[in-house]
């Protein structure tokens, strides 16, 4: 076989002219070499948030954004992040934003995301007004791969979400390695609930309510069961500044993607949040060359939060009043306990009693858990006056006035009268004086009235009939009639029709036949 070589010097092909046209295309140019893996991991994290990625070019660098009704995420790459950056060919006064499909972006960085060593660098040529974006991947052995990704149309102008980190009153900073094992176990759920107090964070998820309908919605809502609950103490948190204890729910899928990205870099995760209904802002701020920010919508119970913020001032004012009342009440209780100690007799029993009373009083002064989650304690004014009452249990000696005098009851001993029989009269003489005669009493038969005794057996029979089990009736068959006739013949009770015993076993005659029929045969 002979190889055929063609010379394109005189007649250049259309492919070469297209390459020259793309090389001469206008737009911003970005070259990444050392931070190529970070760029590919950012695309992998954004792929779990939205189906499209918005690419914005400005003097501040390159921005990757995803927008949705409930979430907003942005990756900001400064000019120092790239090995080379040229933004002089774009219109700086206009908004330079283009939209790229997430499937196309994943396809471009497919090999880089898996950590292949063949990729050396990447070059972007982005013109927001053009129809395509050129990506040139530099590989080992002087191999270059050029990709022309088609851009999508911008349906509407992008409105910047209105939120601010400085407006959030609660801040928590924690390493991603601490959060990742907790959220990996809950990744099968749609949302999780986070409760924040001064002691730390409590993250929990609940069993799914698949069988909830409009008929059993109220029952299932009250029967919400906790599936997993994890508490992170303040010792494991880098920074934990809480002004208002809150509890809210948020989506776990987007939050987990940012936490996974931070864990790959070994950096911290900063969380800015406020009342339920305001966004939860998750950011990574440890690296000077790039910044990541995710704003998630939060949701709380309908009974505990007012989105206008009117309830916040009331709860804060009540909380301050409760603290003042609790301090005043604790000081008064201490004075009472001191008075009890001084009034005691000084024995060991009284000291132990006073100590137990002071402990009981402090436990009573502590308020019960509140229904409102923003206020951890019930106001002291709502407690009953019996909770403030102090009772002293001391053993007192009985007063002489109250002593009961035990008096012995006296019984009058009546004299026993004894009569002595005179010796003059003996028993024999007394028997002779008394004559005993037996007088027979005749009872005439006429005067005898016969008494008839009737046994009341009817109610017993009725009871027996009630509880009597009916026996099943048996159907009469031809064999029963035949056996009855045979029984009558043997007993001699059958006079009309007589039968011979041999007829029972005579097959020629067939069934049983009377004597008259047998003689005729």
UniProtKB/Swiss-Prot annotation:
Residues 355-370, 493-504 have a biased composition (Polar residues). InterPro entries: DNA_clamp_sf, Rad9/Ddc1. It comes from the Eukaryota. Residues 1-20, 318-375, 492-521 are annotated as: Disordered. Disruption phenotype: RNAi-mediated knockdown disrupts hus-1 localization to the nucleus. GO terms for cellular component: checkpoint clamp complex; nucleus. GO terms for biological process: cellular response to ionizing radiation; DNA damage checkpoint signaling; DNA repair; DNA replication checkpoint signaling; mitotic intra-S DNA damage checkpoint signaling. Putative component of the toroidal 9-1-1 (RAD9-RAD1-HUS1) complex, composed of hpr-9, mrt-2 and hus-1. Belongs to the rad9 family. May be a component of the 9-1-1 cell-cycle checkpoint response complex that plays a major role in DNA repair. This is Cell cycle checkpoint protein hpr-9. It comes from Caenorhabditis elegans. The lineage of its organism: Eukaryota, Metazoa, Ecdysozoa, Nematoda, Chromadorea.
């Amino acid at each position: 076989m002979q190889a055929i070589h063609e010379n394109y010097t005189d007649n250049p092909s259309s492919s070469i002219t297209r390459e020259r046209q793309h090389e001469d295309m206008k737009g911003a140019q970005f070259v990444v070499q050392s931070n190529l893996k970070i760029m590919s991991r950012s695309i992998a994290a954004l792929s779990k948030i939205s189906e499209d990625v918005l690419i914005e070019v400005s003097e501040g660098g390159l921005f990757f954004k995803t927008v949705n009704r409930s979430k907003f995420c942005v990756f900001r790459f400064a000019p120092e992040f790239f090995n080379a950056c040229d933004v002089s060919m774009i219109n700086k006064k206009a908004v330079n934003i283009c939209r790229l499909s997430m499937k196309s972006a994943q396809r471009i960085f497919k090999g880089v995301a898996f950590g292949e060593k063949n990729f050396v660098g990447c070059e972007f040529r982005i013109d927001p007004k053009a129809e395509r974006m050129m990506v040139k991947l530099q590989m080992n052995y002087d191999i270059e791969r050029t990709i022309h990704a088609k851009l999508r149309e911008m349906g509407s102008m992008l409105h910047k979400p209105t939120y601010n980190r400085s407006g959030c009153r609660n801040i928590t900073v924690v390493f991603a390695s601490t959060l990742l094992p907790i959220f990996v176990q809950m990744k099968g759920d749609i949302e999780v609930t986070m409760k924040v107090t001064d002691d730390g964070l409590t993250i929990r998820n609940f069993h799914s309510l698949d069988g909830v309908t409009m008929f059993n919605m109220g029952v299932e809502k009250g029967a919400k069961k906790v599936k997993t609950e994890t508490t992170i103490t303040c010792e494991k948190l880098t920074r934990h500044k809480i002004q208002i204890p809150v509890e809210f729910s948020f989506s776990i899928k987007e939050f987990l993607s940012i936490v996974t990205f931070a864990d790959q870099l070994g950096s911290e995760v900063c969380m800015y949040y406020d009342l339920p209904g305001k966004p939860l802002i998750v950011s990574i701020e440890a690296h000077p060359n790039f910044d990541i920010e995710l704003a998630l919508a939060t949701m709380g119970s309908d009974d505990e939060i007012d989105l206008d913020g009117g309830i916040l001032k009331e709860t804060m004012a009540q909380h301050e009043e409760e603290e003042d009342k609790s301090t005043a009440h604790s000081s008064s209780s201490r004075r009472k306990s001191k008075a009890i100690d001084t009034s005691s007799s000084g024995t060991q029993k009284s000291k132990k009693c006073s100590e137990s009373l002071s402990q009981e009083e402090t436990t009573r002064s502590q308020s019960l858990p509140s229904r409102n989650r923003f206020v951890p304690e019930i106001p002291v004014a709502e407690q009953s006056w019996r909770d403030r009452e102090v009772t002293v249990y001391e053993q007192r000696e009985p007063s002489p006035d109250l002593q009961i005098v035990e008096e012995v009851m006296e019984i009058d001993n009546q004299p026993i009268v004894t009569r002595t029989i005179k010796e003059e009269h003996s028993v024999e003489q007394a028997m002779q004086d008394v004559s005993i005669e037996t007088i027979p009493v005749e009872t005439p038969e006429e005067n005898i009235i016969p008494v008839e005794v009737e046994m009341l057996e009817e109610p017993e029979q009725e009871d027996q009939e009630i509880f009597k089990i009916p026996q099943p009736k048996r159907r009469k068959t031809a064999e029963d009639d035949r056996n009855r006739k045979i029984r009558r013949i043997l007993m001699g009770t059958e006079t009309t029709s007589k039968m011979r015993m041999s007829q029972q076993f005579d097959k020629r005659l067939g069934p049983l036949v009377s004597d008259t029929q047998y003689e005729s045969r």
